[in-house]
Amino acid sequence: MEIINTIAALRHRLDACRKAGKSIGFVPTMGYLHKGHLTLVEQAKAENAVTVASIFVNPLQFGKGEDLEKYPRDLERDSEMLEAAGVDFLFAPGVADMYPRPMETVVDLPGLGGELEGKARPGHFAGVATVVTKLFNIVQPDAAYFGEKDYQQVAIIRRMVDDLAMPVRVVPVATVREADGLACSSRNVYLTEEQRAAATIVPKALDEAERLYKAGMRDTAEMEAALAAFIAREPQAKPDVVAVRHPDTLATLPHLDQPFLVLLYVQIGTTKLLDNRVITIKSKKEAAE
């Protein structure tokens, strides 16, 4: 694996790959990797001749008072993991490489990015869309891989790629979970042992949504209220976002008469955890079988 720190050097190496007719798969990350990231790498490798991963803690997507400074970083550890996983190129730029001067240009999707997690974190998704656009311009991948844990982020990137006619295939990859059901996340490292146990309320709430639906609950507002109350039973959990939405458009749904997305953004201590599940609607025949 070759570690590259500058835009010019990465472009030079990838231009040679493209001239040789090799497809490029791209896995953008902020580092402190876990098995969810490695699953993205595995799929990128399976579908492309060359795999590029990036590690960049992007300051544009952190708001005031968020965890930019304390976000976990360990480039040596991450490099070893990516090399063992078979990545060809690791792009690890510094802030000065990515943003040599203050960014005047911002990519923003205010409709999709201004609600749900975006409402709780103003400006977050504009920062995400801007850095992903820049990374796509640098890497020029054939396909890019993102975890479905960040469901809203994936929806925003897909819409951005479609709106701007970017020649990139966006590939969502299923959420990878720990043994107790908690979604893998770099921020899980913040949790104390007690908080880690409390955090399982998040995947349990997704199970509760399935149970309530199967028990006959069809009103969206009733479902959201029931899930918020379920999460609030855990004293250490504060539900910032409990939303039921259309899985493709993230539009609101008055009634649960089609597949629906349950999206959760829950604070445990000072750590905010994301999770989601698409709950499919079975036909009467399927339900009876």
From Swiss-Prot:
GO cellular component annotations of the record: cytosol
Compartmental location: Cytoplasm
Presence of the UniProt keyword Ligase in the record: yes
Entry keyword Protein transport: no
Gene Ontology MF terms in the entry: ATP binding; pantoate-beta-alanine ligase activity
Residues annotated as binding ATP: 30-37, 147-150, 176, 184-187
Main subcellular location: cytoplasm
Reactions catalysed according to its record: (R)-pantoate + beta-alanine + ATP = (R)-pantothenate + AMP + diphosphate + H(+)
Enzyme Commission designation: 6.3.2.1
Annotated metabolic or biological route of this protein: Cofactor biosynthesis; (R)-pantothenate biosynthesis; (R)-pantothenate from (R)-pantoate and beta-alanine: step 1/1
Annotated keywords: ATP-binding, Cytoplasm, Ligase, Nucleotide-binding, Pantothenate biosynthesis
Active-site residues per Swiss-Prot or TrEMBL entry: 37 (proton donor)
Family (UniProt): Belongs to the pantothenate synthetase family.
HAMAP family: PanC
Biological role: Catalyzes the condensation of pantoate with beta-alanine in an ATP-dependent reaction via a pantoyl-adenylate intermediate.
NCBIfam families on file: cyt_tran_rel, panC
Note: The reaction proceeds by a bi uni uni bi ping pong mechanism.
Protein name: Pantothenate synthetase
Source organism of the structure: Allorhizobium ampelinum (strain ATCC BAA-846 / DSM 112012 / S4)
